[in-house]
């Protein structure tokens, strides 16, 4: 079993980075891995522990460390900024990849490589547009476009999208024979699926 270490606190770190290069990772990606692992090395230095003392509790403390602006940045040794959950998870993913490499190299890891769990992320809930805002958007070509034909075309497209929920690619590919006199539109969707949608009276006025 391999137990030799690099000159720094992280064993086989240089070998790991070299392996990334050998597998055609971009220089930017390799740099990001190196930077993320330098943060982990800083954490070890501040906690005054070494790799052999690694355990699940240390990993949880590292997550708290990443969440704190009191941590030191690599090289400059300055206070860091608050990291978003997505940035913390990217840093933890780098650590998981490094641990996985050590496992593949049969290095005696103090903990399983997959013991590093990602943190929960906050879901960004997109604001639903107000009805008045949607109507204003649909009507905008009528007073923003100088060319009458362009205004009429764009208004018809937006009215159709608003009334039917069709994809824009579906609207742009419509032919006149796809619409019947009742306002029903025949759609050939993805995977050759076929369906019908119906225009509102309002939308039909602009076609």
Give each language-model segment a name.
Residues 1-207:
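Conserved catalytic core of the tyrosine transesterase superfamily
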